[in-house]
Amino acid sequence: MPIGVPKVPFRNPGEEDAVWVDVYNRLHRERLLFLGQEVDSEISNQLIGLMVYLSIEDDTKDLYLFINSPGGWVIPGIAIYDTMQFVPPDIHTICMGLAASMGSFLLVGGEITKRLAFPHARVMIHQPASSFYEAQTGEFILEAEELLKLRETVTRVYVQRTGNPLWVVSEDMERDVFMSAIEAQAHGIVDLVAVENSGDLT
């Protein structure tokens, strides 16, 4: 039987009694955001709204985006990425589990020097076509020219944010390339790898 979203107590400043709120609501108040599903328009709009709201609330405190995602739709993913670059606070990205396709695109989009992977996390990059075909299911047909532009956009972001040459990124995106956390660090997708059973970073 599904248990639903867990609830935790939260006390507003100046109030004596705590109220029960869902755990994600509580974590959002601490500026912790979660992408734990495929990227689609709904989760994209939710994350964008949270980033903008929390930036208005305090534009000096960093935000933290935890990612465990198999990928998803390209355009909603790019919308999240652009918002990450637009809002004033630095956004830390943390890969736990898997950051594949659009998940890895958002991972690399975190503030440079503030992108982290857990030690057993996996990262996968590839060209945007496969996730688009999956998302399509007859709803729309993506023109080849538009797909090429999207691929160029995604490739350019990886080049800019990893420091790898264009030919390396283009070659990697020809197929599914899976990486360990250490390999993702060497590839420039993350800057830090968490050390197991320790609060230290390498």
Curated annotation (Swiss-Prot):
The keyword Hydrolase applies. CDD domains: S14_ClpP_2 (cd07017). The keyword Chloroplast applies. It comes from the Eukaryota. Disulfide bonds: none annotated. It catalyses: Hydrolysis of proteins to small peptides in the presence of ATP and magnesium. alpha-casein is the usual test substrate. In the absence of ATP, only oligopeptides shorter than five residues are hydrolyzed (such as succinyl-Leu-Tyr-|-NHMec, and Leu-Tyr-Leu-|-Tyr-Trp, in which cleavage of the -Tyr-|-Leu- and -Tyr-|-Trp bonds also occurs). It is an enzyme of class 3 (hydrolase). The active site is at S101, H126. InterPro entries: ClpP (IPR001907), ClpP/crotonase-like_dom_sf (IPR029045), ClpP/TepA (IPR023562), ClpP_His_AS (IPR033135), ClpP_Ser_AS (IPR018215). Cleaves peptides in various proteins in a process that requires ATP hydrolysis. Has a chymotrypsin-like activity. Plays a major role in the degradation of misfolded proteins. This is ATP-dependent Clp protease proteolytic subunit.
